[in-house]
Amino acid sequence: MAEENQEETLELKPSRKPPHFVLIHGMSLGSWCWYKIKCLMEVSGFTVTCIDLKSSGIDSSSVDSLTTFDQYNQPLIDFLSSFPEQEQVILVGHSAGGLSLTSAIQRFPKKICLAVFIGASMLKNGLQTDEDMKDGVPDLSEHGDVYELGFGLGPENPPTSAIIKPEYRRKLLYHMSPQQECSLAALMMRPAPILALTTAKLEEEEKEKGQEEQVPRVYIKTLLDRVMKPEQQDAMIRRWPPSQVYELESDHSPFFSNPFVLFGLLIKAAVSVGSI
């Protein structure tokens, strides 16, 4: 387990091209949530891309227009589709962003040298079964009615969007994070396309069958997480064992509550596959 909460900077070897990190946010967040990690990476000489998925961050899509996971995940797919064939990225996903990582691994295994899941849904086939839902979807029912739901297709149909109510956010998402980060999130969070997320039934591309297991995966456990509970993380790790498991003492939002140690673990993961 990482012990020290210190800023790290690295001097890259001149002959080696710095790794390209691609950071994927979770439900209701956006590329903005990575601003501390992005800064630490860039001052250390790394290339970083933070992507807004559909209806997230500054993406202008209507949340109620998204009914499939592929629609929601399209910005990541577009990015990887246009990425040079001879180059690779390190994908990093938080929370529901893990579903985006798995989809990308299935479609572009040769363009990904490492996938890092941070307190994230790590399910080989997405949300196919009741067991997948139990392990990979947060169950916050013990806290009461915590979600604001939107019914863009009418009240007779399943909800199209969801966001945690303001009064529950600090308790569930940010209980170890500085107050200013909670204030930032209050300004920036948007309803998530819950209908699209629950359709994330993932299958390998026929031409890439068998390739996904060649992509190394690292799981970073968020040990004090009140959303993706540690027992859920353990269950997903048992079912689809990653190459390595790291532990981080943080809430559900380590990019706010423990950014320096999180940065160090991401660098450690990159070193483990020879990217640095």
Curated annotation (Swiss-Prot):
PANTHER family, per database record: METHYLESTERASE 17, METHYLESTERASE FAMILY MEMBER
**Pathway involvement of the protein, from the record:** Plant hormone biosynthesis
Q: From what organism does this protein derive?
A: Arabidopsis thaliana (Mouse-ear cress)
Please provide the Gene Ontology terms (biological process) for this protein.
indoleacetic acid conjugate metabolic process; shoot system development
- Record-annotated active site: S95 (acyl-ester intermediate), D225 (charge relay system), H252 (charge relay system)
Record note on disruption phenotype: Longer hypocotyls when grown in presence of exogenous MeIAA.
The Gene Ontology terms for molecular function here are: hydrolase activity, acting on ester bonds; methyl indole-3-acetate esterase activity
What protein name is recorded for this chain? Methylesterase 17
The record describes the protein's role as: Methylesterase that efficiently and specifically hydrolyzes methyl indole-3-acetic acid (MeIAA) to IAA (auxin). MeIAA is believed to be an inactive form of auxin that needs to be demethylated to exert a biological effect.
Q: Which domain of life is it from?
A: Eukaryota
Substrates-to-products reaction catalysed: methyl (indol-3-yl)acetate + H2O = (indol-3-yl)acetate + methanol + H(+)
Q: State the UniProt keywords alphabetically.
A: Hydrolase
Q: Please give the tissue specificity annotation from the record for this chain.
A: Expressed in several tissues of seedlings and adult plants, with a higher relative level of expression in the seedling shoot apex and the adult stem.
**Family matches, as InterPro entries:** AB_hydrolase_1, AB_hydrolase_fold, MES/HNL
> Which residue ranges does the record assign to the AB hydrolase-1 domain?
19-138
Report the sequence similarity comment from the record. Answer: Belongs to the AB hydrolase superfamily. Methylesterase family.
